Amino acid sequence: MTQIRRGFYGPRVVAFGGGHGLSASLSALRLMTQNVTAVVTVADDGGSSGRLREEFGVLPPGDMRMALSALCDDGEWGQTWRDVLQHRFMSEGPMNGHALGNLLILALWEHFGESVTALDWVGQLLDIKGRVLPMSSTPLEIEAVVDGDGGRTTVRGQVAVATSTGHVHHVAVIPKNPPAQAEALVAVEEADWVILGPGSWYTSVIPHLLVPELREVLRTTKAKRALTLNLNAEKETQGMSAADHIR
């Protein structure tokens, strides 16, 4: 299954990010190349993803589900499976709020015992234009030091950091120095372009640079690199200029 995406045409593009920002980037990139690889953050701790992560001890699947959906084509097959993958159950019971795609990814992870093979199988089912990979094989936590009205505090968790109203002074991932997904390193090394963002700056973009192997391959790759910033500032980047993002 790891070889099913060879032979694509167009430039080799790797997109870093997570959530809605990465989804928007992938929706545009798939119109320009079929050789696109999404490298997705694995620190989500909210909603359906957070519940599955806590209960099963797996990578949070939600951002990968969104990336897979974004790479579906515009035909009936692609759009039907996109909608099915994104479908959320509404009930009074424990299934409430779960996305079907999260459950499908979880089932394939348990079946294969390996995340990349499972994601490739979902990609084949959806006939996506590209590939989706986790940035690390280990679920991560985000921890930030935030300067707010009450002084400097430490905030832990993707949701908590993303909704923080203070100025983020420092951000880290736990565990420290996590392993990068091997296939992601190869994709960056062989890429023509690497795109960072758009998305939540401290919780979807910066975490990729806190994985030492990813940071190093991004530094040494011969690929051109582009940074895409959000059109509107989020709470975690309120008051930051474009230059502030790259200092």
Residue ranges and their predicted role:
Residues 191:
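An anion/phosphate-binding loop that grips the pyrophosphate of nucleotide cofactors and donors
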Residues 33-34, 220-225:
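A short helix->loop->beta-strand "cap" motif at the edges of active sites that frequently abuts
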Residues 2, 242-247:
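C-terminal functional extensions of proteins
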